[in-house]
From Swiss-Prot:
Pfam family, one: Abhydrolase_6
Organism from which the protein derives: Escherichia coli O6:H1 (strain CFT073 / ATCC 700928 / UPEC)
A Gene Ontology biological process term: menaquinone biosynthetic process
Enzyme Commission identifier(s): 4.2.99.20
Pathway assigned in UniProt: Quinol/quinone metabolism; 1,4-dihydroxy-2-naphthoate biosynthesis; 1,4-dihydroxy-2-naphthoate from chorismate: step 3/7; Quinol/quinone metabolism; menaquinone biosynthesis
Assigned protein family: Belongs to the AB hydrolase superfamily. MenH family.
Top-level taxon of the source organism: Bacteria
PANTHER family the record matches: 2-SUCCINYL-5-ENOLPYRUVYL-6-HYDROXY-3-CYCLOHEXENE-1-CARBOXYLATE SYNTHASE, PROTEIN PHYLLO, CHLOROPLASTIC
Protein name (record): 2-succinyl-6-hydroxy-2,4-cyclohexadiene-1-carboxylate synthase
Subunit structure: Monomer.
UniProt catalytic activity: 5-enolpyruvoyl-6-hydroxy-2-succinyl-cyclohex-3-ene-1-carboxylate = (1R,6R)-6-hydroxy-2-succinyl-cyclohexa-2,4-diene-1-carboxylate + pyruvate
Alphabetic keyword roster: Lyase, Menaquinone biosynthesis
Functional note: Catalyzes a proton abstraction reaction that results in 2,5-elimination of pyruvate from 2-succinyl-5-enolpyruvyl-6-hydroxy-3-cyclohexene-1-carboxylate (SEPHCHC) and the formation of 2-succinyl-6-hydroxy-2,4-cyclohexadiene-1-carboxylate (SHCHC).
Lyase as UniProt keyword: yes
């Protein structure tokens, strides 16, 4: 079994750019950014429970990493960058810390490196279970209307929230709930030490209005790019800013 993905081929000899979307997104999420890099071959992945991979279920991050590796092999991707947003960024960091063959580097936008104590993990588990129950049982428009009121999305205006609620409500609530629980921050290890000891290139992007993740970025041994005029979802709010940062990263 492999993950559903869309592949776009570029020039031979350059590494692939493998894009991983955030929770409730799909393979289209990164394409406005990715298509600015037509020289590179691009793979836009649907994570389990999402888009064309909605029927694929996992028990945890190890399953996701295994599926991602099988997917890369199926496309004969031997050299690649992982580029992930939020959940996709956490998947990228988890996979990269398992020393993937062929990995050139990781670019994470607004991805959490992991909670640092049992109390935080217990609180997050309670929260994610409550959200998962809502995703399973309530209309998605109602759930996402509340989802986008969370503090991390404070920089969104009303029009942006309405647009996101309409877009995300096309998902399957049950499969979102399953993926939310399987990849909860409550079950993700703290990756700070692994990332500090890494052997791969590591870059971190965050919106200038995303105070939570700017603070987290400061804790990581990563080259951080702050995206102007953007909050947590920087590649959606300022795609040109993210394109500029990614172009700078890939030039090294």
């Amino acid at each position: 079994m492999i993950l559903h993905a869309q592949a776009k081929h570029g020039k031979p000899g350059l590494p692939w750019l493998v894009f991983l979307h955030g929770f409730s997104g799909d393979c289209h999420e990164w394409q406005e950014v990715g298509e600015a890099f037509a020289d590179y071959s691009r793979l836009y992945v649907d994570l389990p429970g999402h888009g064309g991979s909605a029927t694929i279920s996992v028990d945890g991050f190890d399953d996701v990493t295994g599926l991602l590796c099988k997917t890369l092999v199926s496309y004969n991707i031997l050299n690649f960058w992982l580029v992930g947003y939020s959940l996709g960024g956490r998947v990228a960091m988890m996979a990269a810390c398992q020393e993937l063959a062929g990995l050139c580097g990781v670019v994470v936008e607004g991805g959490h490196p992991g909670l640092q104590n049992a109390e935080q993990r217990a609180e997050r588990q309670r929260s994610d279970r409550q959200w998962a129950q809502r995703f399973r049982t309530e209309p998605l428009t109602a759930v996402f209307a509340d989802w986008y009121q969370q503090p991390v999305f404070a920089s969104l205006n009303d029009d942006q929230r309405r647009e996101l609620v309409a877009l995300r409500s096309n998902n399957n609530g049950a499969t979102l709930a399953a993926m939310l629980e399987a990849t909860s921050l409550a079950v993700q290890p703290d990756l700070r030490a692994n990332l500090s000891a890494r052997t791969f290139a590591f870059y971190y992007l965050c919106g200038e209005r995303d105070s939570k993740f700017r603070a987290l970025a400061a804790e990581l041994a990563a080259d951080c790019h702050v995206i102007p005029r953007a909050g947590h979802n920087a590649h959606r709010e300022n795609p040109a800013g993210v394109i500029a940062s990614l172009a700078q990263i890939l030039r090294f």
